[in-house]
Amino acid sequence: MRRAGRSRQFSSVEEAFSTSAARPGRRGRRSGRENTAKFVPATLSASTSFSRIEGISSRSVTLASPGSRSGSGPRSGPRLGPANRSTSRYRWVPAAAGWTVGVIATVSLLGSVSPLIRYLIKVPREFINDYLFNFPDTSIAWSFVLALLAAALTARKRIAWLLLLGNMILAAALNVADIAAGDNTAAEIFGENLGFAVHIVAIVLLVLAYREFWAKVRKGALVKAAAVLVAGDVVGILVSWGLVELFPGTLARQDRLPYVVNRVVGFALADPDLFTGRPHVFLNAIFGLFGALALIMATIVLFQSQRAENALTGEDESAIRGLLELYGKNDSLGYFATRRDKSVVFAQSGRAAITYRVEIGVCLASGDPIGDPRAWPQAVDAWLGLCQTYGWAPGVMGASTQGARTYREAGLNALELGDEAILRTSEFKLSGPDMRGVRQAVTRARRAGLTVRIRRHRDISPEAMADTIARADAWRDTQTERGFSMALGRLGDPADGDCLLVEAIDRDGSVVAMLSLVPWGTTGVSLDLMRRSPSSPNGTIELMVSELALNAESLGITRISLNFAMFRSAFEQGAQLGAGPVARLWRGLLLFFSRWWQLETLYRSNMKYQPDWVPRYACYEDARLIPRVGVASVIAEGFLVLPFSRRDKVHTGHHPAVPARLAQSGLLHHDGSAPDVSGLRPERTDAEEARSRLPEQVRVRLAKLKVLQRNGVDAYPVGCPPSHTVAQALDADDQQDITVAGRILRIRDFGGVLFAQLRDWSGEMQVLLDNSRLERGRTADFTAAIDLGDLVEVSGQMGFSKKGTRSLIVTDWRMIGKCLRPLPNKWKGLTDPEARVRTRYVDLAVNPESRELIAARSEVLRSVRQTLFAKGFIEVETPILQQIHGGATARPFVTHINTYDMDLFLRIAPELYLKRLCVGGVERVFELGRAFRNEGVDFSHNPEFTLLEAYQAHADYRVWIDGCRELIQNAAQAAHGEQTVLRPGADGRLQPVDISGIWAVKTVHDAVSEALGEQVDPGTSLSTLRKLSDAARIPYRAHWDAGAVVLELYEHLVEDRTEEPTFYVDFPTSVSPLTRPHRSRPGVAERWDLVAWGVELATAYSELTDPVEQRRRLQEQSLLAAGGDPEAMELDEDFLQAMEYAMPPTGGLGMGVDRLVMLITGRSIRETLPFPLAKPH
């Protein structure tokens, strides 16, 4: 919804929410929450508006910079990393002053509480107090003031510099006055001169180091803090006055009230000699304690008011929610940025923000920046500028890998903090040995009668939500709600309607446990709150998590972020077998601390769900700051609770941090609800930035497209069939009206006459545009709108140009497709083979040879089908996804079906399913389809290929010798008009080779014998074959039998050297598991391979129909698979059961159609496939 009361109206959502980063801003002292309104952005664009790294080791301590960031824009302001600190020669002054005052504060405190220390330091304390610096004997209040001053000096606070400088000037003036009095002893004169010299040196150094004290103090409730201080001092004075009246000691009555005021309020700065007498010694410490308590309370109130005054405003939260809607898809902790006790700083562009909290001088950022990742560096710069402005030490808790890299680029270092547990709901299941513990816990909870209810917060009534909040408070095991970077800290807020509540309900209908989860983008949830009743049964949490994961699809959830496990890798590595002593010691130390902080419990409670572990990092500026950042994190997360601390659940901020233009847009809501960002498209890059990266010709064409659109021309209209193809138009009568459509390849402009070359699938023709013949517009309009590559539709009549070229005389034309990228060279086309593969569409558009190859492939496929149909075969389709990989020996591709939670294989061959059809009585059957083998890619292999398998009942492998030859010869006839194939000639050009007639047939063993010059037959021993292989330098494996060695010899010595098409028959039985043994020759199977010019084209079997023998052979294959052979076939019980119903004697053929096309066209497989697999860039 939009809110009324805007200061102005914007024409679009994009205009209001976008902010230009073109005007570089200054960071430094102008970059902070209080100064964000001073940024004046330029004109806005839709894509820079309110509009998302890799390679970090989970154990890395320092993240390497990946280099430049595309589109991030220039950094504004100086870097604040350790290497970019002040280089002034006085940069040491703040630390030295802080340490000096801090030492005095520490000694003063010890002296105030210990009489022994007070006695030991009496002489130096009196000298310092008299001549150098205020150092009363006992004043806890003064010690606290000095401690605050020391901390402020170290943090380079300007106000601390001013106070210390004023103190030094006043002390120097007092020394001058004492020296001028002239009634001092020699010791006093020495002390006064020494003190004056020290004061002058300190004053000079402070003045020279003025620029080193740049830090400001945040706005806070000074009046409220002063009131608390006055009230505390008044109470302290009254109580102290009463005590001194009860225990006056020797203190005179008229001096008692002034003495108390000096000790409680005046920090005992007045000389004790001014008062008559002394009270009891123990009262001085009590009086100073009262003063210190008043100061402490006032300081806490001031700090709390600073945090509350500068916390999220409603507009800030509304802007953050808008950024989350546009860019929060990948940040599981992003929603926690809406926590209202945090502060926020925005990038100058308004496209990113960082939420943070200040504890003990550490500005602790909460996780990753929110918003557009391209604007993250700007947000980090603004945040570091804020730290510099107020003298805070920067720190980050819970950054992701991408976020940690961004912080690293800004000068911080990163340390692995732990891992976040992410459940992928599509992969979650209760089955399997790894989930046994969860499965048993869920079973126990269900037996106890528990059920689970899942609702969105918006669907819960106010009364029910009140009960939920009461239960959450009652079941909390701590006094306060914990959390900072990974907790929301509130329940029942109307703005959190998308949050998810999961409840466990017992048999009586009572809620016994609950989970509250915040949105993570649109398809995820992130755990915020987990509570359970002490009376809930074991397994309650496991039941809720499991039910949420198992029912996630109905809720539109694909991922769940569970708890965060600190030091997960240390627990895991230290428990591994063979872990080193350091890993075991570190794990033991963590186990010890787990007694109090549940480190191991959180790890194990997440690990049982088998989640994905995503590392999270802590970032810091300097290693010396790690302890301080750690303590600040402990305080922020609520493990260390400071007095009077509170965590606000409502908006307390009064200083909006959103950029002024965004705040004035009227789109942000004061109640913190999300703005209307439906008109924004976050996935789009900045238009100007994107256009600047495009080639010039593309930008020119885009500009023409915009001109056409402005003129009302649809550059991509609805299709209308042309009356003629180009080929038909060239043969048409001159008086016939003709409409053709195609792509413009060339344009020649002669002023009033224009010639263009137009191509469609059937061919090319010249079109002639003459101003005198055009019915609408002029040739200039054509040249202004049309570029090479554009698709146009032209109408007219056929005629001739002056040079006698047959042309279409155009009377009308229209654009039917604007080409935004230029075509390759009009004469050479695409010459790079890799480019032709990757941009096949361009190759087809400009290269006639590529079109001819596509057409030839189509003719081959059609011929194969027609030949088989003519023989009475029927075509079928069998499953491509198979549960068992079989039918051939090859490595399969593996995928997974979530519904049945099982692996499936892309088929390597359709053979086993086709044979099932043969069992069923389909006597002549074939399939022409895709098969997949996870093997090499080269000139003749592609992982995805077209395979023909055909089976003919009552036939054998000899029948398919003639059948296969006929298939190939018919295909060549269809492609070339004659039974020829193309082969490279002596000059490298393709020449036709006749393949008509009968082809040669040889046995495998005879062919191997010819190649070796030694006789080899099925009875040749394995040892002899090995010797022959060694002599021929053919490698083999030790576990191969004689058949495998013969096959290896055949592949190297015969197949690779074959030229003319040849059938090699009778392969060894051991390498043909699905083939019947030869009817008359033992040791070989009835199988042949067709080889031509070194490439295997087809294979055929007399199929093995004996189910007993088939089972034995497949069992042998399954043993090989179990032994680790990835290519061996698995045992398919369903296929074997089908074979037991008897399959008729059958001859089977398998042919690689891609290789057939290669043979006929003389091209490689990459050239003949429309889209071969190409290695990614």
Curated annotation (Swiss-Prot):
Residues at which Mg(2+) 2 binds: 1096
Cellular compartments annotated: Cell membrane
GO cellular component, one term: plasma membrane
InterPro entries for the chain: Aa-tRNA-synt_II (IPR004364), aa-tRNA-synth_II (IPR006195), aa-tRNA-synth_II/BPL/LPL (IPR045864), LPG_synthase_C (IPR024320), Lys-tRNA-ligase_II (IPR002313), Lys-tRNA-ligase_II_N (IPR044136), Lys-tRNA-synth_II_C (IPR018149), NA-bd_OB-fold (IPR012340)
Region named Disordered: 1-40, 61-85, 673-693
Comment on bound cofactor: Binds 3 Mg(2+) ions per subunit.
Residues that span the membrane, as ranges: 93-113, 135-155, 159-179, 189-209, 227-247, 281-301
Known cofactor(s): Mg(2+)
Example GO molecular function: lysine-tRNA ligase activity
Low complexity compositional bias, start-end: 65-82
Any Gene Ontology biological process: lysyl-tRNA aminoacylation
Keyword Transmembrane helix: yes
Sequence positions that bind Mg(2+) 1: 1089, 1096
Signal peptide: none
Gene3D superfamilies in alphabetical order: Bira Bifunctional Protein, Domain 2 (3.30.930.10), Nucleic acid-binding proteins (2.40.50.140)
Main location group: membrane
Bilayer topology annotation: Multi-pass membrane protein
Region (Phosphatidylglycerol lysyltransferase): 1-676
Protein EC: 6.1.1.6, 2.3.2.3
Keywords associated with the record: Aminoacyl-tRNA synthetase, Antibiotic resistance, ATP-binding, Cell membrane, Ligase, Lipid metabolism, Magnesium, Membrane, Metal-binding, Multifunctional enzyme, Nucleotide-binding, Transferase, Transmembrane, Transmembrane helix, Virulence
Source domain of life: Bacteria
Catalytic activity: tRNA(Lys) + L-lysine + ATP = L-lysyl-tRNA(Lys) + AMP + diphosphate; L-lysyl-tRNA(Lys) + a 1,2-diacyl-sn-glycero-3-phospho-(1'-sn-glycerol) = a 1,2-diacyl-sn-glycero-3-phospho-1'-(3'-O-L-lysyl)-sn-glycerol + tRNA(Lys)
The keyword Cell inner membrane is assigned to this record: no
Stored PANTHER family: LYSINE--TRNA LIGASE, CHLOROPLASTIC_MITOCHONDRIAL (PTHR42918:SF15), LYSYL-TRNA SYNTHETASE (PTHR42918)
Function noted in UniProt: Catalyzes the production of L-lysyl-tRNA(Lys)transfer and the transfer of a lysyl group from L-lysyl-tRNA(Lys) to membrane-bound phosphatidylglycerol (PG), which produces lysylphosphatidylglycerol (LPG), one of the components of the bacterial membrane with a positive net charge. LPG synthesis contributes to the resistance to cationic antimicrobial peptides (CAMPs) and likely protects M.tuberculosis against the CAMPs produced by competiting microorganisms (bacteriocins).
Protein's UniProt name: Lysylphosphatidylglycerol biosynthesis bifunctional protein LysX
Organism: Mycobacterium avium (strain 104)
Lineage: Bacteria, Bacillati, Actinomycetota, Actinomycetes, Mycobacteriales
